[in-house]
């Protein structure tokens, strides 16, 4: 087989792409690169878990090992892509490693907007965007 489909991001979109690709082709190599632990969970459940006192782990539907096994993909947790070489069909990780791809999917997700707030209650404002 040739180079894999590389998916950058392990959120809902990244896992949806991996699942759909797997439905289309059981043999295509897929590598998922995740800046975090690489487990699968519903991001909207983060605020629910926080408000009900549940642990972050309680909303995890599968860790990276389980998800890799289930989808028959390679998951590279705690890796960051720092460069994309389009003509060379490669991504470079923060440690300098290059991963070559046949197709590249950027499923980077969203970050919360931090408002420039002032005042006495500023320390009581929480933002939550991932399990960490």
Language model features: what each stretch is:
Residues 1-6, 61-132:
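FAD-binding core/adjacent interface of flavoenzyme oxidoreductases
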Residues 2-74:
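Beta1-alpha1 glycine-rich phosphate/pyrophosphate-binding loop at the start
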């Amino acid at each position: 087989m040739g180079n894999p489909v590389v998916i950058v991001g392990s959120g809902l979109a990244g896992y949806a792409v991996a699942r759909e690709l797997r439905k289309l082709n059981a043999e295509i190599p897929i590598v998922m690169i995740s800046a975090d632990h690489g487990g699968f969970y519903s991001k909207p459940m983060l605020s629910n878990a926080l408000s009900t006192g549940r642990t972050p782990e309680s909303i995890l539907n599968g860790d990276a090992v389980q998800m890799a096994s289930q989808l028959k993909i390679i998951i590279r947790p705690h890796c960051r892509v720092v460069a994309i070489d389009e003509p060379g069909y490669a991504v470079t990780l923060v440690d300098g490693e290059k991963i070559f791809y046949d197709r590249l999917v950027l499923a980077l997700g969203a970050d919360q907007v931090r408002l420039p707030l002032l005042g006495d209650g500023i320390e009581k404002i929480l933002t939550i965007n991932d399990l960490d």
